[in-house]
Amino acid sequence: EAMNIPSVSRCVNLIADTVSMIPIKLYKEEFLNGKRKTVEIEDSRCDLFNLDTKDTLCGVDFKRALVRDYLLFGGAYAYINKKRNAVKSLHYVNHENVYITENFETIFKDYNILVQGRSYKPFEFLKILRFTKDGAHGLGIIEENKELLKVAYLTLKFEQSLVSTGGSKKGFIKSEKKITKEAMDSLKRAWRELYCNTENNVIVLNDNLDFKEASNTSTEMQLNESKASINNSILDIFGVPTDWNWETFIKTAVMPILSAIECALNRDLLLEKEKKSFFFAFDTKEITKGD
């Protein structure tokens, strides 16, 4: 339901599309003549992440899916298919199919990942978690801001109800004398058709009946103002500036996600011996290519 809210859908898709365009690269830090130098390394793991996962998703769709799950549900998961120490493929797993079995102590924490009844160790999965406190669970925007999103969704449904009635005003019928049950039932049917069928927007009242229009509620009168306030609040929770400034958008909405993905890749895709000098990082110069 959250993705039915236009501002939520726009933010999620814009952020996911932006991240999907940025390639990940592998770098190595070397010391030459006493000076530290960073060089780019050609590596098949980058091709798996950027181009072809060797699963059903291409690199772009793979990154989009991860970012959407990360933002909305707080956790994005991908199975790392290895043969010995070589990564052969990456397999996105929908967050709905991931179940965490906890074995936590206050200090020493451990858990397993269950997918379709099969148990996996954490190192077998790429895990990108939002606002995690235990390394196993993340906090998504839907859970973190459920009250705001509920109001936004109800506002959307309220708008739809206004449109479905063709803008017909609410009101009440005043009668100079008592109405028979048959006349009352007929009037109810006609009134129901007036509000349910946009093609039938005319109702004829007898001489003794008079329609009195009800005044607009405060919700109706402040609808546009309320929508603007809600939309701005939704932009805030995604880190999207209300003026849609591109540079600010990259810094506040995109860079934190890139950092989370980089951290996950360095932890889960690098061998222990590689972690001393190798690291994955996004080439953010690609964001402004063509500007």
Predicted segments, located by residue:
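Activation/maturation switch segments at domain boundaries
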Residues: 5, 15, 223-224, 247-259, ...
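C-terminal, well-structured catalytic/ligand-binding subdomain of enzymes
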Residues: 232-255
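Short, conserved catalytic or adaptor-binding loops enriched in Gly and charged residues
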Residues: 194-196, 270-273
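Structured, contiguous alpha/beta core segments that scaffold functional sites
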Residues: 1-223, 228-229, 233-236, 240
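A translation/RNA-centric and nucleic-acid-associated enzymatic feature enriched
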Residues: 261-269
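Short, surface-exposed acidic
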Residues: 199-200, 239-246, 274-277
